[in-house]
Amino acid sequence: MSRLQEFYKSKVVADLQAKFGYKCVMEVPRITKITLNMGVSEAVADKKVIEHAVSDLTKISGQKPVVTKTRKAIAGFKIRENYPIGCMVTLRGQRMYEFLDRLVAVALPRVRDFRGISGRAFDGRGNYNIGVKEQIIFPEIEYDKIDALRGLNISITTTAKTDDEAKALLTAFSFPFRN
């Protein structure tokens, strides 16, 4: 069991149960999955770009991503149907907690001019999204070996019913929120 998973079971559950008045332990919100998505529009012109994106996402997540393809052709963007356009990976369980630990403790503090993450990126149902502009904030990516700076979207899905519950959960995991 990872460090954050033990911390969640021992401390966070009791704190959230007391704060929100849950009667049952199963009512306490938890993180169900983390989805990492990297859209690579340059893959239309050069097919090798998608391979670099897949290798970067594999290093970051520790799991092989799925290559996402276009659903329909759009002539204005010069895209045909079933063109590889990005990659995504869904983390659950042990790998999810290990990634969350690395994100909070190592990656986010390495962002240039970092003042905390926005508290307004919740979707209304207790899920949180973070946009990362450069993949080099993760220590697994070596700056000398990348071909281009690419951003990625990190979606944290929780069982929380409201944004306040989700924010309390993520704050307990020491997410550095701005105000």
From Swiss-Prot:
The family this protein is said to belong to: Belongs to the universal ribosomal protein uL5 family.
One of the record's GO molecular function terms:
rRNA binding
By which gene is this protein encoded?
Answer: rplE
Assigned keywords, A-Z: Ribonucleoprotein, Ribosomal protein, RNA-binding, rRNA-binding, tRNA-binding
Disulfide-linked positions: none
Domain of life according to the entry? Bacteria
Protein function = This is one of the proteins that bind and probably mediate the attachment of the 5S RNA into the large ribosomal subunit, where it forms part of the central protuberance. In the 70S ribosome it contacts protein S13 of the 30S subunit (bridge B1b), connecting the 2 subunits; this bridge is implicated in subunit movement. Contacts the P site tRNA; the 5S rRNA and some of its associated proteins might help stabilize positioning of ribosome-bound tRNAs.
Picking any one GO biological process from the record gives:
translation
> What name goes with this protein?
Large ribosomal subunit protein uL5
Assembly description: Part of the 50S ribosomal subunit; part of the 5S rRNA/L5/L18/L25 subcomplex. Contacts the 5S rRNA and the P site tRNA. Forms a bridge to the 30S subunit in the 70S ribosome.
Q: Which GO terms describe its cellular component?
A: ribonucleoprotein complex; ribosome
Against SUPFAM superfamilies, the record matches this protein to:
RL5-like
Q: Which InterPro entries match?
A: Ribosomal_uL5 (IPR002132), Ribosomal_uL5_bac-type (IPR020930), Ribosomal_uL5_C (IPR031309), Ribosomal_uL5_CS (IPR020929), Ribosomal_uL5_dom_sf (IPR022803), Ribosomal_uL5_N (IPR031310)
